[in-house]
UniProtKB/Swiss-Prot annotation:
Keywords for this protein: Initiation factor, Protein biosynthesis
Protein name: Translation initiation factor 2 subunit beta
Assembly and interaction partners: Heterotrimer composed of an alpha, a beta and a gamma chain.
Naturally occurring in which organism (per UniProt): Staphylothermus marinus (strain ATCC 43588 / DSM 3639 / JCM 9404 / F1)
The family this protein is said to belong to: Belongs to the eIF-2-beta/eIF-5 family.
Gene: eif2b
Gene Ontology MF terms in the entry: translation initiation factor activity
Gene3D superfamilies per the UniProt record, alphabetical: 3.30.30.170
SUPFAM superfamilies in the record: Translation initiation factor 2 beta, aIF2beta, N-terminal domain (SSF100966), Zinc-binding domain of translation initiation factor 2 beta (SSF75689)
HAMAP family per record: eIF_2_beta (MF_00232)
Lineage: superkingdom: Archaea
Amino acid sequence: MTRRIRDYKFEELLERAYSKLPARTVSKETFEVPRAEVMFVGGKTLILNFKQITDVINRDPKILQRYFVKELGVPAYMNESGQLILQGRFSSHVINRLIDLFVKKYVICPTCGSRFTKLIKKGKVFILKCEACGAETTLEAF
């Protein structure tokens, strides 16, 4: 015979709900994105440690490259060394500010603050899926 919801005690229902949640990883480590190492060559800006930055934030370099193109309004490309080359001269302050904004919007989970997220593109929107709490947040694509 199956039990109805009102046959359960509150504690039993609460325990059942908790058992359905994904495992929560508690990490005390601090999340620090490396500061961009910027160098100017003629009228171009090179981000020397671009590959290292994308590895730390766990994002495809092409996505961060597209973000820079949209925000700065200039062409950009990656060389074989994993450096990003932007047309135009941009200070390290501007570059680091954009990286911080990208991380805040497209990496950090707005629900639990975890950095363990995946960015999934569906049509014209991104979905930020948190691997720690399971939350999904819809974001505007760029």
